[in-house]
């Protein structure tokens, strides 16, 4: 994906496979525009019909969901972290909601990253639609790739991610990535629904980092369309 692609070019690529439109998202009186997939049911039916889903955790388009954890993370960053003039990296950004929400927190530079090409396309479109391209860069970042990433050679002040700890096989590579790229004194924050909380990751992280955990309530839309209260764990890993 070229960083120079225009919004129209990105939308042309996206609409070759998805029926999408921008939907308003009101956050504290600030209206954001976020791409919404209107034919997700048909897209999933196609994946199932072609036997493309071997492992639901890996093959389903989880990147397309606006995860409530992104809103919880933004609240935590705003209230508990020093963000002015700091650098920020979002891992597993999906459609980029967290980075877009956190764009108002005074970061000097932000990177929204994922390993899924479709996620990067949607994030780039959302960034351009909200005129944040001078603040947020969209990059393919694979934490499982060995060695240091030269793009983050100066280190990152804050690394954040919502709902990426569900794969146990990712825990060790993720901690290795933090060791290489988190600045001294930097913090990584992971938000997870309590139903998917991973104590094993915190135990591993505590061998090398200072680890703390807190809990914040959030609201999701249940299967019946009604709001449902949930509790989220916020795990902070400090170098």
Task: Show where each model-derived region lies.
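S-adenosylmethionine-dependent methyltransferases
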Residues: 1-239
């Amino acid at each position: 994906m070229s960083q120079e692609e225009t919004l129209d070019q990105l939308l042309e690529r996206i609409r070759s496979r998805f029926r999408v439109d921008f939907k308003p998202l009101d956050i504290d009186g600030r209206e954001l525009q976020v791409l919404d997939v209107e034919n997700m049911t048909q897209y999933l039916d196609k994946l199932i019909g072609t036997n493309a889903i071997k492992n639901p955790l890996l093959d389903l388009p989880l990147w397309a969901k606006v995860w409530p954890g992104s809103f919880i993370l933004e609240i935590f960053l705003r209230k508990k972290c020093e963000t002015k003039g700091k650098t920020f990296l979002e891992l597993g950004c999906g459609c980029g909601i967290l980075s877009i929400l956190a764009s108002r927190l005074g970061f000097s530079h932000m990177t929204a990253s994922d390993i899924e090409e479709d996620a990067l396309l949607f994030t780039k479109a959302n960034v351009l639609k909200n005129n944040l391209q001078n603040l947020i860069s969209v990059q393919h970042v694979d934490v499982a790739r060995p060695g240091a990433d030269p793009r983050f050679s100066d280190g990152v002040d804050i690394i954040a991610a919502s709902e990426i700890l569900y794969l146990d096989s990712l825990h060790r590579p993720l901690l290795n990535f933090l060791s290489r790229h988190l600045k001294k004194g930097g913090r990584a924050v992971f938000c997870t629904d309590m139903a998917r909380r991973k104590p094993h990751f915190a135990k591993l992280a505590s061998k090398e980092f200072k680890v703390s955990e807190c809990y914040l309530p959030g609201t999701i839309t249940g299967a019946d369309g009604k709001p449902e209260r949930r509790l989220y764990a916020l795990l902070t890993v400090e170098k």
